[in-house]
Amino acid sequence: MSAQELRDKTPDQLRDELTALKKEAFNLRFQQATGQIENTARMRQVRRDAARVKTILNEKAAAAANAEA
């Protein structure tokens, strides 16, 4: 998921996306621990997508704070 796609979403949609990514990361960790994971690169991809979502959320929060001031 690209940063531009994330910037087009609302903060509520981003929070939902972050929740879904955290759940997926949790499941992937368990799959890795039990040796059932097929695509190990997906763990890295999910972790980076979550970081992108958090970054965009922080950018939107800062922009909203500056707009109020």
UniProtKB/Swiss-Prot annotation:
Gene this chain is encoded by: rpmC
Name of a matching Pfam family: Ribosomal_L29
Family: Belongs to the universal ribosomal protein uL29 family.
GO molecular function, one term: structural constituent of ribosome
GO BP term, example: translation
Cellular component GO terms, alphabetical: cytosolic large ribosomal subunit
InterPro entries: Ribosomal_protein_uL29, Ribosomal_uL29, Ribosomal_uL29_sf
Organism per entry: Jannaschia sp. (strain CCS1)
Keywords annotated in UniProt: Ribonucleoprotein, Ribosomal protein
Protein origin, superkingdom: Bacteria
Entries under Gene3D superfamilies matching the protein: 1.10.287.310
Classification via CDD domains: Ribosomal_L29_HIP (cd00427)
Protein name as catalogued: Large ribosomal subunit protein uL29
